Amino acid sequence: LKRKLTSKKASRWLIVGIILILCGIVATVWSVNNSKKKTPHHKLKPQPALIDNTSTRPASYTTKEFKNLLSQNYPDIYKNLNFKQKPTFYVIPGLIQSAAIKYTPPGQGQPGIAYDMDPQGLAIIDHKYLIISAYSKSKTFDSVLWVLDFKTGRFVKTIALNNIDHVGGITYDEDHKRLWVATINQEQRAQVQSVPLKEIEKYNFKKQKKPIKFEHGTNLSAPLRTSYMTYHKNKLYIGYFDKVQGGQLFAYKLNKKGLFKKDKMQDGLALPSENWSTYSQIQGISFDKNDILLSTSYGDLNSQLLIFKNKLNKPNYNLDLSEADKTIILPPYMEQIIGKDGEIYMLFESATALYRQNPNLLHMDRVIKLKVKFKGLENSKE
């Protein structure tokens, strides 16, 4: 009898042991599979400080310093950042130095290094890339595009352009896989040029040592210059402002191929299908669901994000400051914005070489993401 009891106890302990081993194996497999599903941002090795002569590190602050300064100076902005979805910030490359094509002699037309690049435009490509456009403040170098990995924030490459334009407006047409860039023609009038995604992915500045080629270009009848631009539902929305005449926004309807309609041309200039008056200090525009987002900035005063319900189809409707449904205060020198998936991506130029000399300025050396459903101090009609 004792032998039987001892045998039963041994069998029980053996079963318990097997169960524990199986649980351990299942837990290990689940842990490994789960870790593969998530992008291990915290395990990514730091990139080199320079990649092909373009700086990849923040120009002004460490991540900890940046968070502290933003939370101290703009606490409501800080509270509305999305810390759950990584990356929280995108470091703006090229602010310390950037590869570029020399515009002026000596070395005109040759690759060189620019130390005064000023970020202006922002675009997101298929949740794959985030692109920042920049121009040389001294006009010594041609303008560039910096390409970042959208999911990790890591720098990918620099794309050289064949002009010294402000490139304040860039936008991606996800329907036709085409990036549009606002430029200026030889008559100093506004034009837009495009490059297909496949060419962006193929381009290698280090090997080619020359600017990327635009595929299409169209001269515009209005505005005379371009301050900002966005693509939305087969239309390009292009705007401009000056301090005297205020702001204007023009819509250009594209054809099925995503290009300007030939029957909407006059004297070689594309004609807009619609136009609206806007607030006079608009730097960026974007659409997100039923909202229109406008960024305003001028000088070293605080910037503003204006959120409107989309009523562009209503007659006599204008995007004036008084019509905004919500106004959010942000740091100075905000440029282009993008509304996407309930978040607003914001680019600033306050960390350029020129503005870094101002010790009283918060140098926004990163693109930040703000929730559209902002909670905090704001002016709202709701």
Which sequence ranges carry the predicted segments?
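Structural signature of eukaryotic scaffold interfaces centered on beta-propeller domains
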Residues: 112-126, 168-177, 221-237, 283-288, ...
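Structural motif
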Residues: 139-146, 187-199, 244-255, 300-311, ...
